[in-house]
Every structure is written in C-alpha cells, then in structure tokens.
Amino acid sequence: MIFQALAAADTPYQYGGQSHATGFDCSGLVAHVYRAAFGLVLPHNSRAQSKLGETIAREALQPGDLVFYNTQGQAYSHVGIYLGEDKFIHAPKPGSAVRIESMRGNYWTRRYNGARRIASL
C-alpha cells in the first residue's frame, strides 16, 4: 500500500481527480491507493472517509492509516495517508502536486482532526 501511495508522488493536484492520468485531489488519492492496494472502494470525499474504520490515537498511528485535517474551516476537509515517522503523503491544493510532509509542522499540527484505520485491513 505504501508503494502505491509513494508512486503517486509528484502527480499534479486536480480537483475531482483520482488517477495518475487525471491527477489527484486529497480524497481521490486515498481512494486510488486503497483500490489499487486492496481492491477496496472508498468514497471520494474526505468527510465520508473520516467515518470509515476505527478511530486511532495519534501516538498509535501505523503506516496506511488515514490522517485528517481542517484546511477549509471545516473539520475533516483534508485527508492524507500516514507513512510513519510523523510523515504523511497527500494531494495538498491546486497548483501543487502529491507530496510527503511532516505532521510536526506548525500548520499541520494546528489543523489535525484525527486518524482512522480502515477496519477491513
């Protein structure tokens, strides 16, 4: 699964996108990775994804867990995939590309909403 996520690095952001060909938005990246790795069909919406699986405490995060942020003034408006060592991969915003970032940065720490582990894994 982490391989599929890392393979998306540097793919351009595209609202509504969920493939290497079209680009990715945040929830489209998550949906693509889970479909490619496990054959799971996840909703293409970060808030809907935030209701899947089980809640995970930040200190219990494992690679593959979903991490959620408030980036638009609403809880769970952004999602990424935890990679380990306080890093996650995500599709940040228009004009950017899929990239790895540290969860320790001030921007992400202040906006952290929680994490989920998809139960069927």
Regions found by a protein language model. Name each.
Residues 1-12, 117-121:
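Intrinsically disordered, low-complexity
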Residues 7, 35-36, 81:
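Solvent-exposed polar/charged
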Residues 11-63:
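Catalytic cysteine-centered active-site loop
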Residues 40, 56, 70, 76-77, ...:
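Aromatic- and glycine-rich peptidoglycan recognition patches
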Residues 64-65, 86:
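Structural motif
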Residues 65-71:
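Short beta-strand segments that buttress and anchor functional surface loops
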